[in-house]
Amino acid sequence: MKILVLNGPNLNLLGIREPEIYGKVSLEEIEKDLTGFAENQGVEIIFYQKNGEGELIDLIHRYYREIDGILINPGAYTHYSIALRDALLAVGKPAVEVHLSNLYKREEFRQHSVTAGACIGYIAGFGVDSYRLGLIALIDYLKRRDNDGASGKA
């Protein structure tokens, strides 16, 4: 099983950017933890962070034939990127959207996700654990789908 993990704009600044909201753990630490956890599950992850919307879309286009699913933290693109939403839908791979903070406890303009509707699930508000929880949910979904022939969105 292979999962593409995508991180949107400014997530490369985790650990220094607004630590009272996002915590003090760096994206590199999240990648290391997630990679180790995935390996223990027999899962390979491909991990990227890009600040450009088109770069994230290009990665989806590049890898969709090789992967089983997508774990994505779109960052600010969550709130307005129809193009990213369309890319997720176009490739037909199950995706889970994750966020460190609970968007519904943030500013009003952050309380809507246009990308979540292209995903089978959404996990937010658990800090760095959101990534691991999202990965667990995606792996379990893929295993059930493969074993039971389940399809479609939850």
Swiss-Prot record:
It comes from Carboxydothermus hydrogenoformans (strain ATCC BAA-161 / DSM 6008 / Z-2901). HAMAP family: AroQ (MF_00169). Homododecamer. The active site is at Y22, H99. It catalyses: 3-dehydroquinate = 3-dehydroshikimate + H2O. This is 3-dehydroquinate dehydratase. It holds the Pfam family DHquinase_II. CDD domains: DHQase_II (cd00466). It comes from the Bacteria. Pathway: Metabolic intermediate biosynthesis; chorismate biosynthesis; chorismate from D-erythrose 4-phosphate and phosphoenolpyruvate: step 3/7. GO terms for molecular function: 3-dehydroquinate dehydratase activity. NCBIfam families: aroQ, PRK05395.1-2, PRK05395.1-3, PRK05395.1-4. PANTHER family: CATABOLIC 3-DEHYDROQUINASE (PTHR21272:SF3). Belongs to the type-II 3-dehydroquinase family. The gene is aroQ. Its EC number is 4.2.1.10. Substrate binds at N73, H79, D86, L100, S101, R110. The record marks R17 as: Transition state stabilizer. Catalyzes a trans-dehydration via an enolate intermediate. Keywords: Amino-acid biosynthesis, Aromatic amino acid biosynthesis, Lyase. GO terms for biological process: amino acid biosynthetic process; aromatic amino acid family biosynthetic process; chorismate biosynthetic process; quinate catabolic process.
